[in-house]
Amino acid sequence: MLDLKQTNRMLRKLERFVDIIEPMIFEKVGEPGPVSAFATLERFHCIPEDSLFDPIEKGYKWGEEFGYCWFKTDFVVPDGLGGKDIFIRPHISGYEGTLWVDGVPYGNFSTKIVFTGHGNHYCDLLKKDAKAGEKIAIDLEYYAGHSYKGCHPTENNPLLTYDFSYEGIDICVKNYAIQEFYFDLRTLVQLVKNLPESSFRRASVINELEKVFKEIYQSPDDVDRDEFMAALERAKPYLKKALSVKNGDDAPKAVLIGHSHMDTAWLWHVGETVKKCARTYANQLALMDEYPEYKFIQSSSCHSDFLRRKYPDLFARIQQKVKEGRYEPNGGVWVECDCNITSGESMVRQFLWGQRFTRKYFDFTSNCFWLPDTFGYSAAIPQIMKGCCVDYFLTTKIDWNDTNTFPLDTFYWEGIDGTKVFTHFNRTHIWPDAEDLMTYVAGTPSNDHSCIKDKRVTDTRVISYGYGDG
């Protein structure tokens, strides 16, 4: 058995090992055919015609403020990849991008938010259960971004550059063994970091991690690939044993659902919001193809109407997922509205137009006023909600207070006329992993002020995970 100093050193090495194997989840197996590009300032809502594209090579430069660049290619599935899930990883710099597969928007790429050395959504599903000989049409739409001086008066916002480049496209497969080991080990390392040192659970996890540490190689460069993978396989049972321990019935619970908050008009033109909605919601459908258990909630009927008008094929696919009960168009209002200076009539119209749209196009009546991103709340909201057949209220930012903290996160809110609505504060901008769930649900030794406030009231918290704004 290791002493305390040795144990801490082992845990640091395992934490580093998590970062080492993360890039190994996707393995390059090829490249697509010749690539052509088309740079433009025009906002297209469909793929531009072929005559506008010119052939390019690696090193191609593009970019100007408010500019877009489209990249066109295809990939023929070789016999060796038949029956496998195929992924695509572009090496294209830019602010954000959309993946189109066989003529329809199917995913998004984000380099603006960096995690583990690369942007989020850096490698997207291209084709589920691909067929040998199948030709896949690939179009990539990238946005260069823009400056927004003056939005933050205290910030010195220098002139941005838009010098972007194309450095190739990789076709990849996923190493599911690496992925499983990565998430299992990451979960257990986070548990150890956030449980009290006096915890018996923590001690039992450390015992299993010590066995894992003795089996694995610290770097894939230490041995050949087969031996590296064999070592992971030998260590796997110890991870599974540690993860098999269940919490008791009185343990707190987290309700997880995917969500991408979308500002209708903030640091960009509304026309760009339309494209943000397309790439974001298309990506949710791709995630549903990859993960059958995945569910997503979208607020703001206005955003659905953007897609109905500009991306009708994508809108039809969303309608199908709503029928399946996997895509929930629940928010109650037309847009997530201001609640400080708006009039009562205006708020009623928000619910009227929001409910009218979801009933007409999704056969869905919203039961929740989903409003995570507002900075104030009219005392008339409960009365207006109930009058519009909306029973539940969810918000977030009042729970960010660090000076006069709000004492509850689940309660009945009573309005000016005595009307009550069931209210819950969720948490956003977090990962659905062990560290964040412990922090915002149960609490940790280093953070006991972000968790469920009054544990006599509830043992459950909603966690909506995912990044927003396209």
Pin down the residues of each PLM region.
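Short Pro/Gly-enriched beta-strand edge/turn motifs at strand-loop
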Residues: F53-G59, F393-T396
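A short beta-strand element within beta-rich, extracytoplasmic domains
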Residues: F75, G82-Y95
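Short linear interaction motifs
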Residues: L52-E57, F71, G80, R234-K240
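Catalytic-domain carbohydrate-binding cleft regions of carbohydrate-active enzymes
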Residues: L2-I47, I92-E96, Y106, K128-G470
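Surface-exposed coil/turn segments at beta-strand junctions on protein surfaces, enriched
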Residues: E64-F66, L81, D129-G133
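Short beta-strands within extracellular/lumenal beta-sheet-rich domains
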Residues: K61-D79
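Solvent-exposed beta-strand/loop surfaces of large extracellular or lumenal domains
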Residues: I47-E49, F53, E57, G94, ...
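Intrinsic-disorder/low-complexity, polar/charged segments enriched in Ser/Thr/Lys/Arg/Asp/Glu/Gln
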Residues: Y68-D74, D85-F87, K135-A137
